[in-house]
C-alpha cells in the first residue's frame, strides 16, 4: 500500500517539476517578446498559459486522489496540501505572463524602454520559480529561504522602473499612456516574484509545518 502511495507521490513531484518548467518557459517567452518588440511572439504565450491551466487541473486531481484513496501521515499530508497551494500560484504566474503578452501586442512593435530592468526582473523570476519547485521536490528549506530573499531584487527593480517612468511622464507627458503600459508590465513581473515567494513559503510549510509569510 505504501509503495503505491510513494509511486503516486513521485508522480506528483514529476508533475510539479513539469508545471514549474512551463512557468519558466512562459515567463521567458513573454520577456523575449518584450525585448524583441514582437507581437507575434507574444501571441504564443496564450497557448502555454492554457497548458499551465491544464497541468493545474491534473495535479489537483492527483492530489485529491492521494487524499481520498490513501491515508497520508502528517508529513505526506503537508506535502500534498502544499502542492495544492503552490499550483494556484503557478497558475497565476501563467496568467500574469499572458497579461504581459497582451500589453506587448497592444504596443504593436514599439520597443520597450528600461528593457534592461524588465529583463532583469524576468530572469530573476524565472530563477525564483526554478528554485522554489526544486526546493519542494528536495524538501530543501534553505533553498526556499533563498527564494524568499531573492524577491527583494525583483522589488528593487520594480521601484527603479517606476521611478524612471515617472520621470519620463514628467518630461514627456505625451508618452504617458506608453509609460503606464510599461509600468503595468513591470508590476506583473513583480507579482510573478510574489507568487514564486508564496511557493517557497509553502515549501517551508510542507517540511516544517510552519507557514512563514514574508
What are these regions (language model features)?
Residues 1-214:
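Cytosolic, long alpha-helical scaffolding segments
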Amino acid at each position: 500500500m505504501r509503495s503505491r502511495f510513494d509511486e503516486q507521490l513521485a508522480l506528483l513531484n514529476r508533475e510539479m517539476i513539469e508545471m514549474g518548467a512551463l512557468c519558466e518557459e512562459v515567463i521567458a517567452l513573454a520577456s523575449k517578446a518584450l525585448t524583441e518588440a514582437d507581437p507575434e511572439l507574444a501571441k504564443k504565450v496564450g497557448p502555454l498559459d492554457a497548458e499551465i491551466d491544464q497541468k493545474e487541473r491534473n495535479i489537483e486531481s492527483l492530489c485529491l486522489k492521494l487524499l481520498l484513496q490513501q491515508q497520508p501521515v502528517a508529513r505526506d499530508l503537508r506535502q500534498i496540501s502544499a502542492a495544492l497551494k503552490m499550483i494556484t500560484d503557478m497558475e497565476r504566474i501563467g496568467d500574469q505572463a499572458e497579461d504581459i503578452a497582451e500589453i506587448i501586442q497592444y504596443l504593436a512593435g514599439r520597443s520597450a524602454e528600461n528593457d534592461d530592468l524588465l529583463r532583469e526582473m524576468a530572469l530573476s523570476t524565472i530563477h525564483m520559480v526554478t528554485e522554489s519547485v526544486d526546493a519542494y521536490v528536495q524538501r530543501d528549506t534553505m533553498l526556499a529561504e533563498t527564494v524568499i530573499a531573492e524577491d527583494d531584487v525583483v522589488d528593487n527593480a520594480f521601484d527603479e522602473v517606476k521611478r524612471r517612468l515617472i520621470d519620463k511622464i514628467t518630461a514627456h507627458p505625451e508618452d504617458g499612456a506608453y509609460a503606464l503600459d510599461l509600468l503595468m508590465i513591470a508590476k506583473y513581473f513583480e507579482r510573478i516574484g510574489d507568487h514564486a515567494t508564496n511557493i517557497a513559503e509553502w515549501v517551508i510549510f510542507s517540511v516544517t509545518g510552519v507557514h512563514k509569510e514574508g
